[in-house]
């Protein structure tokens, strides 16, 4: 079992930081999961995922490099094994790397033992192919066991699987602590791009809002958080999936949004590793001042 720990005072970001934008790029290429459960494996569905490794990831790397943005790439173990050249390029570009299950399995549907096996398999893939000790993790559709397993079996510094808070907090159990950095769908370029009735219409076809709508949605969230950031600590999760946001019109949404946000004083695009370091430093300082 585990419990949450929250700071007694408002978090304080480093001097000059008003709104950190925490960038996540999901890099996945699953072949055994489908939008349509009766079609597995589903060549139609997984060929869409392949676009990320073939084109989308490279386009996103170019855009992030153009703006000097270094974020976190959440990579599935099987995707790393199939397309190691993408992950090596991500690492070379200076981005942080985190695990994102093995083949994007929905962990909420799996037994605890199976989830642990897949987590270990993913961690091993990063150690073997990249020489990388994973510092962070985001599970696909977390189960009731996910946090327990992270605390009991792994030495991650942060997890990003939950959707339940505006700011990071500590989860504590099994004699250790992990920082939980929540994210949500409302600033996910993939999800704000989908239609109001969900990804698939009654006719079984994709519904999609326009790129212009997606950009407006991101700007609206940014404006609200930037205003709030004048009074207290806030952060903005910004999530992209390379097989969706890496397509030309969606990639332009990311490019244009970064250009927009960079105009504002105190806005910093950052990775989960960096945000975790800032948060932990302030949390320790608060505890020391109380002691």
Model-derived regions, located:
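Glycine-rich, positively charged active-site loop/lid region within alpha/beta enzyme cores that binds
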Residues: 182-207
